[in-house]
Amino acid sequence: MIEVRSFNGLGGADHGWLKAKHHFSFAGYHDPKRMGWGALRVWNDDEIAPHTGFPPHPHANMEIITYVRDGAITHEDSLGNKGRTEAGDVQVMSAGNGIRHAEYNREPQTTRIFQIWIEPDREGGKPSWGAKPFPKGDRAGSFVVLASGFGTDADALPIRAEARVLGATLKAGATAEYTLGNGRHGYLVAAEGEVEVNGISLKARDGAAIEDESVVKVTALKDSEIILVDAA
């Protein structure tokens, strides 16, 4: 089963400095049919104006993955971590028993991100933050694991959930496949381009909620950049 959630039908808010679209209920947007997808709780499509951002605020008991689509995001937190994550790269914050952080666009142009929240397997624990570059060339033609709670994914950023965040770049006409296990929930968004997911068309920034599909086959109709979450 694949349910398409068109970009134009997503919830959202325009705060001037922040233009946000919500694939699931978040802040002032509430849809009882879209409270999450398995352990995937939030997928926000954010556009952050230059020299603005989110001031310090708290989180707890959530795995927060930020995928930078354009520009760069600068992170600061109460543990003393600081870092700048550029387009195509990923940062992960395990909020654990509590952390405060801020995220700023210190760039001269708009920064565009996907922010993804996944519920952890267990509450509590020491909070942490990390970031890693993932060159788009390394993802050409196949899925690469960007963040994972599985020990076998040694090159991915670690998260505290039985979940994966994967990325791929596909030239028009190319295909990539991913095996989705029994009882798993997949959610796929094309950051750019246009794709077919098991024969169902998705335009850029549409979402596809995937369930009871043993294999996810993605064919690019245009040059495309894809993010997929595999969650319990």
For every predicted segment, state its role.
Residues 1-232:
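Jelly-roll (double-stranded beta-helix
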